[in-house]
Amino acid sequence: YGRSRGLGDVYKRQNPYFLMSALMLIGLIALLITPEGKNNEKRELTFLENFYEPIKDFIKRFNLFAASILLLIVATYRLTDIVMGPMANPFYIDMGFSLTEIGSIVKIVALIASIIGLFLGGILIKKAGLYRSLLFGAFAVMISNVLFSIVAISEPNLNLLSIIVFTDSFSAGIVGTVNIAFLTSLVSKKFTATQYALLTSF
C-alpha cells in the first residue's frame, strides 16, 4: 500500500491501484486452479467439539488463572504494532515526508528489515529459548517505538527515518516469529486449528 501511494506522486493516482489489482489477480488465479486436497473424514463437528472442548482443554492444561494470564499476554504482546500500523503513514506525512519517499524508500526499508527480523527471530528462539525471546522481543519493540519520538521532534530527515523504520520493522519481524512460536506452544495437537484460531483472534 505504501509503495502504491508513492507511485501516486509520479503516475496518475489510479494507476497504482490497477497495478495492485493485477498483482492480486495472480494469487486469485493460482487459488482457483490449485486442486483441493482430499479429505476422507467428512464429519460435521458439533458445537461442543468445535468450540467448547478446545476452550475446556486449554483451561484444564494451564488452570484458569494461568490461562487468563496467558491470554492477557497474547492480547497485548503485539498491541503496539497493531496500534502503530494505521498511524504510520499519516505520521510520516505530518512530519513532512512525501508519498514518494514513504512508498519508495521507507516501505522498502521496512520490508527488508522485517524479513531479516523474521529470520533472526527463529535463530534467537533456538539459541535463547522461547521465553527469553519473548522478553527480548517485547523490550526491542518498546525501544523501537520510543525512537519515533526523535522523528517527531526533528526536521524531516530521510536517513534518520529510514534507520528508525529499519529498527522498528526488524524488531517487529523478530516479535512476529517469536509470537507464532509462542502461540504454537500453547495449543494442543487435538484442537490445534480451533485453539490457534481463537488465540490469534485476541
Please place each PLM-identified region on the residue numbering.
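Helix-to-loop junctions at the C-terminal end of transmembrane segments
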Residues: 116-131
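C-terminal membrane-cytosol helix-exit motif in multi-pass small-molecule transporters
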Residues: 22-40
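C-terminal ends and interior cores of transmembrane alpha-helices
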Residues: 139-156
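Single conserved hydrophobic/aromatic residue that forms the stacking wall/gate
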Residues: 1-11
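Loop-to-transmembrane helix entry/capping segments in MFS-fold secondary transporters
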Residues: 99-100, 189-199
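Juxtamembrane intracellular "pre-TM" segments in multi-pass secondary transporters
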Residues: 39-69
